[in-house]
Structures are given as C-alpha cells and as structure tokens.
A protein has these predicted regions:
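Histidine-dependent nucleotide/RNA phosphoesterase domain, centered on the 2H-phosphoesterase fold
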Residues: 1-196
Length: 196
C-alpha cells in the first residue's frame, strides 16, 4: 500500500518512462529526502469510498496534539519547518506543492491526480455484485460508518491507545521514487529517501 505524493506521468511506454527517469535522476535524491527537512502530519484517518475503490483517507494536521514518539531533531542548518511538534504550519499540501515544483524543474508533470488528496487505496472493486441492490449498498455504507465511528472514538486524538491516529510523513523512511507499472504494487523503487 502507498500514498501517492506526486504522479509524474501515466499510461506511457517503458521507453517514455525511462526517458522521464533519466531527466529526473539528478533531482531524485532531493525529492525523496524532502520529508527529512519538511515535516508534515496527517491525522484523523477515515475510511472513504467511491465507485471503484475503498481507501483510508487523512486530513492535514491543524494543531491537534502530536501523538507520535519524538522524531530525530533537525540541526539548525537543516531546519526548514522544524518538527511536527513545532506546529502544523507546513502541511501535507505544502509538501505536495514542493515535490511538484522540484519535479517540474526536470520534466513536465502529466498526472491523473489533480485534486490534493491524502489517501491509501485499500482495495478496488472487481465488479459491482456486492453493491447490486439498495440493501447491499446500505449494508456496505453502514459497515464503513461503523468503522469510522470506531476510528474517531478509539484512534483519533488518543495518546495511549493501541493505534496512533496520525502519520508524520517521512518518519521511518523518506519518499519512495518509483517507476514502471505502479498500480497494484508493480514497478520498482529507484530510491527511497532518508527517514527520521
């Protein structure tokens, strides 16, 4: 599973993707380690769905209590926005903007995803049999509502819970630059950035 910060291109041949990777290669180390100095938090996980998939979606943090263990502090020369504990002025949307701007210096971005989003796809529907009737759809929606109520009560803003309801982007590892047929776990990693 993954959260896409930036899709550079889609529906291209292997040769076209190879050319994009070659053009971007000098910028990839900076792109993948951007989260080391530009830290943002995602909070309030919820299950969401549309006609093709179900996902866990997050919101950019905006002042909620930091629940994660302390991260490696930044040295003064590395500090861009500090740690998540210093505030949420720098959000995931700022990170997406900065990744876009840095990548755009090397290649033209031709992404399918134009709306800012922070979601991890959990699964895609193979068919609509499970949603074929109003009763099936009502049962599906009720199950998602029940999970979301549990998340809000047991995970959001719970400092000592079994699960932590936030994600500091880049904690443990930086961004993962990948190429190839990436849907459903395909493709390969070019480089993974430094975590904290």
């Amino acid at each position: 599973m993954h959260l896409t910060t930036l899709e550079v291109a889609h529906s291209r041949t292997a040769e076209e993707i190879g050319s994009l990777v070659s053009s971007m290669r000098p910028a990839i180390p900076a792109l993948t380690s951007l989260t080391f100095t530009r830290r943002s938090r995602l909070v309030k996980p919820m299950i969401s769905y549309d006609l093709s998939a179900v996902a866990v979606s997050f919101l950019p943090a905006s002042g909620e209590e930091v629940l994660s263990p302390p991260a490696v502090p930044l040295s003064p020369e590395d500090a861009t926005n500090g740690s998540a504990a210093d505030g949420d002025e720098y959000t995931y949307h700022h990170l997406r903007r900065d990744v876009f701007n840095l990548a755009s210096e090397s290649v033209a971005i031709a992404s399918r995803y134009v709306v800012p989003s922070a979601h991890i796809t959990l699964g895609r529907y193979l068919d609509q049999k499970d949603h074929a009737t109003p009763e099936f759809r009502a049962r599906w929606i009720q199950a998602i509502d029940d999970i979301n109520k549990w998340l809000e009560k047991e995970v959001w803003d719970v400092a000592d819970g079994e699960f932590i309801g936030e994600w500091i982007v880049g904690q443990e590892r930086g961004l993962d630059a990948r190429c190839g047929k990436l849907w459903y776990g395909g493709g390969r990693t070019i480089m993974t950035g430094e975590g904290f």
